[in-house]
């Protein structure tokens, strides 16, 4: 008989074991220790044991769901009227027994008790405070299509797709040539790549998630004035080495002032950043973009990133 309860302190090893046995795709870090879950999930200041619900067959954890309220608009605390179900796992031997349905129903009830009226199914930037760096690379981008069951489960339980993300990687060991045009040549002559700590003006929400990862902010600056034309955040993805067999970095936010758009500065930034990471023996850069963000998808593809998966977020009317 399957029983359901909230998180207990004895659960971390059982959850780590379930993660390893759940046949997750390339979007999930592999070979994770209990310490990884302790650091990225259970040690978060807003972790609520009632938001992590497990399904048990006697003493064995065979499934779990994790839900949380979204961050507020100021990115200073949780408590918005929105929330999300950011993780759902059921052991392959226990699927098609309505365990996932029961877990998501209980997660929805938890969010309702927290005052949440709008629920997303799938990790997004405003709802996922726990699994950044463990699932989805460096950015929350929904449940991965590659995992195979999410779309059918969502349709069967009344969820409708509300957002899709394109998941990209750039192979830094490949023989493909970077693009060349007059703007890029001019940019390279007058700019250089600078590196800095990205946490200088970070918000509480940024620090609780990305502050737990190795990170660097790259800026493309004018040599003469030191004025920054574009910048981006890069995060270490060493937890993916067992799964991917290569050292990887994740691309976060890309920033460019409006007055500098139209000059390919952001493309120059990504190309110079790729060269630097290659010199540091990084062989893969992982990135994602909402399908509605045409500018980012076009930029990534122009810089040599290739789509390898799709992330999906769902909602209920």
Features from the language model and the residues they span:
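Short amphipathic alpha-helix that is part of the acyltransferase structural core
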Residues: 1-41, 48, 52-57, 61, ...
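A short helix-loop-beta-strand connector motif used in the catalytic cores of GNAT acetyltransferases and
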Residues: 42-57, 63, 208-219, 223-228, ...
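Conserved acyl-donor/pantetheine-binding loop and adjacent beta-alpha core of acyl/acetyltransferases
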Residues: 61-87, 134-146, 151-152, 236-248
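A structural microfeature
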Residues: 63, 163-164, 228-230, 309
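Conserved catalytic-core motifs of GNAT/GCN5-like acyltransferases
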Residues: 72, 122-124, 138-172, 306-317
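A short, internal acetyl-CoA/4′-phosphopantetheine-binding micro-motif in the GNAT/acyltransferase core
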Residues: 85-95, 123-126, 252-262
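Conserved acetyl-CoA-binding loop-helix of GNAT-fold acetyltransferases
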Residues: 90, 96-109, 118, 262-276, ...
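Conserved GNAT acetyl-CoA-binding A-motif
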Residues: 111-142, 277-289
């Amino acid at each position: 008989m399957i029983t359901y309860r909230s998180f207990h302190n004895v659960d971390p090893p059982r959850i780590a074991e379930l993660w390893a046995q759940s046949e997750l795709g390339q979007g999930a870090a592999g070979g994770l220790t209990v310490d990884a879950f302790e650091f990225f999930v259970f040690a978060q200041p807003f972790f609520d044991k009632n938001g992590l619900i497990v399904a048990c067959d006697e003493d064995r954890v065979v499934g779990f769901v994790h839900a949380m309220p979204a961050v507020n608009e100021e990115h200073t605390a949780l408590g918005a009227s929105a929330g999300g179900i950011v993780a759902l796992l059921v052991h392959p031997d226990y699927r098609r027994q309505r365990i996932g349905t029961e877990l998501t129903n209980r997660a929805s009830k938890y969010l309702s008790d927290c005052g949440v009226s709008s629920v997303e199914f799938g990790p997004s930037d405003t709802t996922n405070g726990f699994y950044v760096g463990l699932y989805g690379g460096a950015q929350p981008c929904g449940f991965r299509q590659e995992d195979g069951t999410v779309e059918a489960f969502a349709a069967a339980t009344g969820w409708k797709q509300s957002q899709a993300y394109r998941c990209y990687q750039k192979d830094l060991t490949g023989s493909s040539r970077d693009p060349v045009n007059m703007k890029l040549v001019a940019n390279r002559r007058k700019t250089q790549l600078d590196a800095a700590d990205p946490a200088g003006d970070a918000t509480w929400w940024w620090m609780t998630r990305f502050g737990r990862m190795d990170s660097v902010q790259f800026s493309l600056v004018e040599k003469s004035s030191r004025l920054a034309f574009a910048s981006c955040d890069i995060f270490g993805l060493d937890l993916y080495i067992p799964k991917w067999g290569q050292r990887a970095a994740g691309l976060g936010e890309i920033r460019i002032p409006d007055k500098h758009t139209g000059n390919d500065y952001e493309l120059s930034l990504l190309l110079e950043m790729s060269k630097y990471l290659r010199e540091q023996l990084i062989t893969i850069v992982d990135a994602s973009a909402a399908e509605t963000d045409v500018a980012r998808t076009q930029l990534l593809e122009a810089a040599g990133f290739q789509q390898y998966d799709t992330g999906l977020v769902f909602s209920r009317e």
